[in-house]
């Protein structure tokens, strides 16, 4: 496909030169508009001839052809420039209007472009409505036409929900998590006890658990001690009886 020339669709572009904005006024706006990089400016116009011959803009009235004039000015924000075809000192045909807002140049749409855009927007909306209505329309030779909306609702329910992709964490989030972990480590530092030389340090809680005897072992030791006492008592025998003195 051939590349589309930018001049074929001037309604969709704008142009600005920031160096001119501070000095833009009614006297310099036409010079600003005649910049070489401005796509809206026609090099074959009478303004270019007057500029090369260093004449005043009043000489445009005595010439025939395309020219640019300042139609309206509302300094320093708004300027309107008209492109027109001059046929005689008293007869001109407007060709296009351009408006400058805050230094940015736009081409004003003509009536045909406005009507075309509005009609296309309206037709697109009507066509979308008809397409949506036809998707619910059903026909059978014995029943005729009817509307059926349940299939569409069931299809929406059956459609699996797209899984949300896990977004990678940002640098700020990673730094924030590291700062919180360091803060927790400072508030609750781990404690270690060196049990034997050459071994790895063991946490204090674990060392306490190893040092404390289990309750079952304590009970078994108590039972063994009671048994030993009973055995010693049984081996000694009953105590001897002594005679009472009358």
From Swiss-Prot:
<dbReference type="GO" id="GO:0032968">
    <property type="term" value="P:positive regulation of transcription elongation by RNA polymerase II"/>
</dbReference>
<feature type="region of interest" description="Disordered">
    <location>
        <begin position="191"/>
        <end position="246"/>
    </location>
</feature>
<dbReference type="GO" id="GO:0051123">
    <property type="term" value="P:RNA polymerase II preinitiation complex assembly"/>
</dbReference>
<dbReference type="GO" id="GO:0003677">
    <property type="term" value="F:DNA binding"/>
</dbReference>
<dbReference type="InterPro" id="IPR007018">
    <property type="entry name" value="Mediator_Med6"/>
</dbReference>
<feature type="modified residue" description="N6-acetyllysine">
    <location>
        <position position="241"/>
    </location>
</feature>
<dbReference type="InterPro" id="IPR016820">
    <property type="entry name" value="Mediator_Med6_met/pln"/>
</dbReference>
<feature type="cross-link" description="Glycyl lysine isopeptide (Lys-Gly) (interchain with G-Cter in SUMO2)">
    <location>
        <position position="208"/>
    </location>
</feature>
<dbReference type="GO" id="GO:0060261">
    <property type="term" value="P:positive regulation of transcription initiation by RNA polymerase II"/>
</dbReference>
<dbReference type="GO" id="GO:0001223">
    <property type="term" value="F:transcription coactivator binding"/>
</dbReference>
<dbReference type="GO" id="GO:0045944">
    <property type="term" value="P:positive regulation of transcription by RNA polymerase II"/>
</dbReference>
<keyword id="KW-0804">Transcription</keyword>
<feature type="modified residue" description="N6-acetyllysine">
    <location>
        <position position="236"/>
    </location>
</feature>
<dbReference type="InterPro" id="IPR038566">
    <property type="entry name" value="Mediator_Med6_sf"/>
</dbReference>
<dbReference type="GO" id="GO:0005634">
    <property type="term" value="C:nucleus"/>
</dbReference>
<comment type="similarity">
    <text>Belongs to the Mediator complex subunit 6 family.</text>
</comment>
<dbReference type="GO" id="GO:0035019">
    <property type="term" value="P:somatic stem cell population maintenance"/>
</dbReference>
<comment type="function">
    <text>Component of the Mediator complex, a coactivator involved in the regulated transcription of nearly all RNA polymerase II-dependent genes. Mediator functions as a bridge to convey information from gene-specific regulatory proteins to the basal RNA polymerase II transcription machinery. Mediator is recruited to promoters by direct interactions with regulatory proteins and serves as a scaffold for the assembly of a functional preinitiation complex with RNA polymerase II and the general transcription factors.</text>
</comment>
<dbReference type="GO" id="GO:0061630">
    <property type="term" value="F:ubiquitin protein ligase activity"/>
</dbReference>
<keyword id="KW-0832">Ubl conjugation</keyword>
<dbReference type="GO" id="GO:0016567">
    <property type="term" value="P:protein ubiquitination"/>
</dbReference>
<dbReference type="GO" id="GO:0003713">
    <property type="term" value="F:transcription coactivator activity"/>
</dbReference>
<comment type="subunit">
    <text>Component of the Mediator complex, which is composed of MED1, MED4, MED6, MED7, MED8, MED9, MED10, MED11, MED12, MED13, MED13L, MED14, MED15, MED16, MED17, MED18, MED19, MED20, MED21, MED22, MED23, MED24, MED25, MED26, MED27, MED29, MED30, MED31, CCNC, CDK8 and CDC2L6/CDK11. The MED12, MED13, CCNC and CDK8 subunits form a distinct module termed the CDK8 module. Mediator containing the CDK8 module is less active than Mediator lacking this module in supporting transcriptional activation.</text>
</comment>
<keyword id="KW-1017">Isopeptide bond</keyword>
<feature type="compositionally biased region" description="Basic and acidic residues">
    <location>
        <begin position="206"/>
        <end position="226"/>
    </location>
</feature>
<dbReference type="GO" id="GO:0005654">
    <property type="term" value="C:nucleoplasm"/>
</dbReference>
<keyword id="KW-0007">Acetylation</keyword>
<keyword id="KW-0805">Transcription regulation</keyword>
<protein>
    <recommendedName>
        <fullName>Mediator of RNA polymerase II transcription subunit 6</fullName>
    </recommendedName>
</protein>
<dbReference type="GO" id="GO:0016592">
    <property type="term" value="C:mediator complex"/>
</dbReference>
<keyword id="KW-0539">Nucleus</keyword>
<keyword id="KW-0010">Activator</keyword>
<dbReference type="Pfam" id="PF04934">
    <property type="entry name" value="Med6"/>
</dbReference>
<dbReference type="GO" id="GO:0000151">
    <property type="term" value="C:ubiquitin ligase complex"/>
</dbReference>
<dbReference type="GO" id="GO:0070847">
    <property type="term" value="C:core mediator complex"/>
</dbReference>
């Amino acid at each position: 496909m051939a590349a589309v020339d930018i001049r074929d669709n001037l309604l969709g572009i704008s142009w600005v030169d920031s160096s001119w904005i501070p000095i833009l006024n009614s006297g310099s706006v036409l010079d600003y508009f005649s910049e070489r990089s401005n796509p809206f400016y026609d090099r074959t116009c009478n303004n270019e001839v007057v500029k090369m011959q260093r004449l005043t803009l009043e000489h445009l009235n005595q010439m025939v052809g395309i020219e640019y004039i300042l139609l309206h000015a509302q300094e320093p924000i708004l300027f309107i420039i008209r492109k027109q075809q001059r046929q005689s000192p008293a007869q001109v045909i407007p060709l296009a209007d351009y408006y400058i807002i805050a230094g940015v140049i736009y081409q004003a749409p003509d009536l045909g472009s406005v009507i075309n855009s509005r009609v296309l927007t309206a037709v697109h909306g009507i066509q979308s409505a008809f397409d949506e209505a036809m998707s619910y329309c059903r026909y059978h030779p014995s029943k005729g036409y009817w509307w059926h909306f349940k299939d569409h609702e069931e299809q929406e329910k059956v459609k699996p929900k797209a899984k949300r992709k896990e977004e990678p964490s940002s640098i700020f989030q990673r730094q924030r998590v590291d700062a919180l972990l360091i803060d927790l480590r400072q508030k609750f530092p781990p404690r270690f006890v060196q049990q034997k030389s050459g071994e790895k340090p063991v946490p204090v809680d674990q060392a306490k658990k190893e040092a404390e005897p289990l309750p079952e072992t304590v009970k078994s030791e108590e039972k063994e001690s009671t048994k030993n006492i009973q055995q010693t008592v049984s081996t000694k025998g009953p105590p001897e009886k002594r005679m009472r003195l009358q």
